[in-house]
Amino acid sequence: MTALLRVISLVVISVVVIIIPPCGAALGRGKA
């Protein structure tokens, strides 16, 4: 379970790092 959780967390982090920057910049500039 721990290994699975680590793999899942790594995948989620990688996906977030890939997806968030452009969306975060757009949302940040749009809201702020």
UniProtKB/Swiss-Prot annotation:
Disulfide bonds: none
Keywords for this protein: Amino-acid biosynthesis, Branched-chain amino acid biosynthesis, Leader peptide
Domain of life of the organism encoding this protein: Bacteria
Biological process terms in GO annotation: amino acid biosynthetic process; branched-chain amino acid biosynthetic process; transcriptional attenuation
Organism listed in the record: Escherichia coli (strain K12)
Gene for this chain: ilvL
Pfam families xref list: IlvGEDA_leader (PF08046)
Name by which UniProt lists this protein: ilv operon leader peptide
